Every structure is written in C-alpha cells, then in structure tokens.
C-alpha cells in the first residue's frame, strides 16, 4: 500500500532529477547503480532507505534536509 506521502516523495524525486536535467541512466551512472534502481524507486517498486536517499540527493545536487522539509510542508 502506497501512502500519499510516499507518492509525493517519489514525485519530488522525479522533479528534482528533471530539474537537474538528468535522465534515469545519467543519475544511475552518478550513483554507480543500474538504471533499474532509479526506475524502480521512481515507480514505487522499491523504497529508498535513508542512506540511499542521501546518496540520491547528493547525486542530484540537492539538500536532503530542505527536500524533506518541503515534503512535510506539502503533506501536512
């Protein structure tokens, strides 16, 4: 079961990737992961743990604290 917060988290990650002008393949290369890693978390087939989220945020050039603050403002 996917919650609204999980869905919005994924949407914001996709938005951040697109804002960084990166494809899934380009992001996965920065992460040293297969493209399917990015695809699966963006589609909700897998969740990111906190360490993975930090790695994704760094690869996207975003501040993870600000990202989560935005998420929680939007879902409150």
PLM region spans:
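Short, charged recognition helix plus adjacent turn
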Residues: 3, 58, 66-76
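Short basic helix-loop element that most often maps to the first helix and adjoining turn
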Residues: 11-30, 55
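Short coil turns linking two alpha-helices in DNA-binding domains
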Residues: 23, 34-37, 63
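DNA major-groove recognition helix of helix-turn-helix/homeodomain DNA-binding modules
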Residues: 32, 51-67
């Amino acid at each position: 079961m996917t919650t609204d917060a999980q869905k919005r988290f994924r949407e914001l990650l996709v938005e951040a990737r697109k804002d960084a002008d990166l494809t899934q393949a380009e992001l996965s290369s920065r992460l040293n992961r297969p493209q399917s890693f990015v695809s699966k978390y963006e589609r909700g087939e897998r969740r990111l743990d906190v360490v993975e989220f930090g790695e994704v945020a760094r690869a996207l050039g975003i501040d993870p604290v600000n990202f989560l603050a935005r998420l929680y403002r939007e879902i409150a």
